[in-house]
Amino acid sequence: MAASVSASCLNRLSSLAVVLVALASAASAQLSSTFYDRSCPNALSTIRSGVNSAVRQEPRVGASLLRLHFHDCFVRGCDASLLLNDTSGEQSQGPNLTLNPRGFVVVNSIKAQVESVCPGIVSCADILAVAARDGVVALGGPSWTVLLGRRDSTASFAGQTSDLPPPTSSLGQLLSAYNKKNLNPTDMVALSGAHTIGQAQCSSFNDHIYNDTNINSAFAASLRANCPRAGSTALAPLDTTTPNAFDNAYYTNLLSQKGLLHSDQELFNSGSTDSTVRSFASSTSAFNSAFATAMVKMGNLSPQTGTQGQIRRSCWKVNS
């Protein structure tokens, strides 16, 4: 009898999972690269201009925008919930406390520019998705087609930021976190390549440089010189070779055990993803292609479409 009940529960859970995947797929199917062609034909050029201007002034903006998009999408989908200034919302949670404010400032500025051209038409979620792509391109990385038509969430979801894998994650934990979002191991390794730009605080990698053995000794020593064991908010580039260029140096660094975060080096540590890291390290085009594919998949995670949510007039607050 117990076995029968258990089987029944499993069948119901399986059916629910199928329904949820189907709903997510249906929402993604409503996205289109031409969504604003008639309603706001200058939307994409306005976003691109804003991103390029910001990156020229501060190259790290590209990494900030990319990280915002990732952190937004991994919590209940790409709905701009992360952008809401809610004191008890997503921004207040541990995984998001190190997000640089400049990313939010740039998105809010671009939103204001888009609103001046097409008021009430273009969502913050779409602006962030496009800005992340344009930031990568501005730093020499690949481009990809961003599907559009996302709407903005009316709430922030602090309780689900645990979906974001921490920098202390093992390979198994990384694979599990990405699999939960229907992203495969190749997607995971490719998206981790976003760490070819940007910086991290010492507190994010102190355990790695003081306690791990799978790290180049000279590299660890150089980092310890600026990062006391007790931790600090000092910064180090995620890619020490070409920190402001979107390239495949992140992977060549991993081959030399120069991954800044524990989770970075886990990708090349005698595990199942070693061969993918070698492939990306030896071929920029292979990395660029896989990264673009993975970004499209991630950008299509559980969007709000149709009459769901709203088109916020300001990205930092819901419409009154």
Swiss-Prot record:
Q: Which CDD domains match?
A: secretory_peroxidase
Top EC class, one word: oxidoreductase
Q: Which InterPro entries match?
A: Haem_peroxidase, Haem_peroxidase_sf, Peroxidase_pln, Peroxidases_AS, Peroxidases_heam-ligand_BS, Secretory_peroxidase
Q: Which UniProt keywords apply?
A: Calcium, Disulfide bond, Glycoprotein, Heme, Hydrogen peroxide, Iron, Metal-binding, Oxidoreductase, Peroxidase, Pyrrolidone carboxylic acid, Secreted, Signal
Spell out the PROSITE patterns in the cross-references: PEROXIDASE_1 (PS00435), PEROXIDASE_2 (PS00436), PEROXIDASE_4 (PS50873)
Enumerate the subcellular locations listed in this protein's record, separating them with semicolons.
Secreted
Q: Which domain of life is it from?
A: Eukaryota
Q: What positions does the record give for glycosylation?
A: N85, N96, N211
One of the protein's GO biological processes: response to oxidative stress
Keyword Ligase included in the entry's annotation: no
- Identify its protein family: Belongs to the peroxidase family. Classical plant (class III) peroxidase subfamily.
Tell me, what does this protein do in biology? Removal of H(2)O(2), oxidation of toxic reductants, biosynthesis and degradation of lignin, suberization, auxin catabolism, response to environmental stresses such as wounding, pathogen attack and oxidative stress. These functions might be dependent on each isozyme/isoform in each plant tissue.
What is the protein named?
A: Peroxidase 66
